[in-house]
Design a protein with these regions (language model features):
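Flexible "cap/lid" loop of the alpha/beta hydrolase fold
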Residues: 128, 132, 139-169
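Catalytic histidine-centered segment of alpha/beta-hydrolase-like enzymes
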Residues: 268-281
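Short beta-strand/loop motif that positions the catalytic acidic residue
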Residues: 230, 236-238, 242
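Conserved alpha/beta-hydrolase catalytic His-Asp/Glu region
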Residues: 152-154, 172-228
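Alpha/beta-hydrolase fold catalytic core
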Residues: 1-50, 73-74, 112, 288-311, ...
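Active-site loop/oxyanion-hole signature of alpha/beta-hydrolase fold enzymes
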Residues: 77-118, 282
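Conserved alpha/beta-hydrolase "acid-adjacent" motif
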Residues: 243-249
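Conserved HGGG/HGGXW glycine-rich cap/lid loop of the alpha/beta-hydrolase fold
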Residues: 37-89
């Protein structure tokens, strides 16, 4: 860990204005009727499909900086979780399982038999549940700032559960910018001011009520018992300076999943899609291979660091190895 609060960044950033301009030129927007809400989504790029699931107090637009760097390699698909405003979602009757069904509805809408999935923060719980439910449809996944079990502390429950009754956007929340500055601003140091303003403004579009319900769903979900049954290769990404989802959550996923590896994003916090999009895109690009060439249980000799006799894959009982991650940055066993 670095004592210096300034975070390191890769050179040559694409500034938010350019990201937005490219998004408007190149991305295709759509709406998927899941039967529970009208899901807004966009697709951007060509190649193997990669679906992005965002975290709490966020929208699909947060992934634009990293997707701008991946669109030449993947058909990137990002969607916004139910917000309960003009999308028809009845959040009071929603359950975490419904979020997973919404993901499958998007698969059906886009004609996806298989796709990679990246789940960020709260979105990682949706990705994990989907991988457990239909492993044949998600051959590999990436969990950034993820968790399988994150019950809220009493004060967190008090502060978030009450938001379920509030209309309006996150941008209207009192003292929001002060809170964001305390938690996230250090990892934007050294970057142009417009990058931080994009983070504040784009996340401000999420709905207050949606955050309240997302907090309730997160508090009630416990996927730890399902982890050993998730046999697909999983890349865990943890920001070195992430105080929102501390390292213990990544370690628990690493210990519980059948075939996972951990990469620590040096200098990053909880929102590397804003602060370190070049690094994040590079790690994603190197980990993933086309779904048609990546069976759900890959060949052990090609993927394990310690292949054993009789091993049929990283998840088989005879295999003691883990999936090696051909990525830059700091890799940890």
């Amino acid at each position: 860990m670095h004592d210096d609060p300034t975070c390191g960044h890769a050179p040559g950033p694409i500034l938010p204005a350019e990201v937005v301009a490219r998004f408007e030129r190149e991305a295709i927007r759509g709406v998927c009727d899941t039967g529970r809400y009208l899901m807004p989504y966009f697709t951007w790029g060509q190649g193997p499909p990669l679906v992005f699931v965002h975290g709490a107090a966020d929208t699909a637009m947060s992934f634009r900086p990293v997707i701008a760097r991946l669109s030449a390699h993947f058909r990137c698909i990002a969607y916004t979780l139910p917000q309960g405003h003009d999308d028809g979602a009845r959040l009071w009757g929603y359950h975490h399982a419904d979020l997973v069904e919404d993901l499958w509805a998007l698969f059906a809408h886009l004609g996806l038999e298989r796709a990679y999935v990246l789940g960020s923060s709260f979105g990682s719980t949706v990705a994990l549940a989907a991988m457990r439910q239909h492993p044949e449809r998600i051959p590999r996944a990436i969990l950034q700032g993820g968790t399988a079990y994150r019950p809220l502390r009493f004060l967190e429950r008090v502060l978030t559960f009450g938001l379920r009754f509030f209309p309006g956007k996150m941008a209207k929340l009192r003292r929001r910018e002060r809170l964001l500055a305390r938690i996230h601003r250090p990892c934007f140091e050294g970057l142009p001011e417009e990058v931080y303003r994009a983070f504040v403004d784009w996340t401000g579009e999420a709905r207050l009520a949606a955050l309240g319900h997302q907090a309730r769903w997160l508090h009630g979900i416990d996927l730890r018992a399902d982890l050993p049954a998730i046999r697909q290769p999983v890349l865990l990404l943890h920001g070195e300076r992430d105080s929102v989802m501390p390292r213990r959550h990544a370690d628990a996923l690493l210990a519980g999943l059948g075939s996972a590896g951990l990469v620590v994003l040096e200098g990053a916090g909880h929102v590397p899609q804003y602060t370190h999009p070049e690094m994040l895109a590079g790690v994603i690009r190197q980990f993933l291979t086309p779904p048609g060439a990546a069976p759900a249980v890959p060949d052990c000799a090609a993927t394990c660091t310690n292949p054993q006799a009789g091993c049929l894959g990283p998840a088989s009982p005879a295999c003691d190895g883990r999936v090696p991650l051909p990525v830059s940055g700091r890799r940890e066993p």
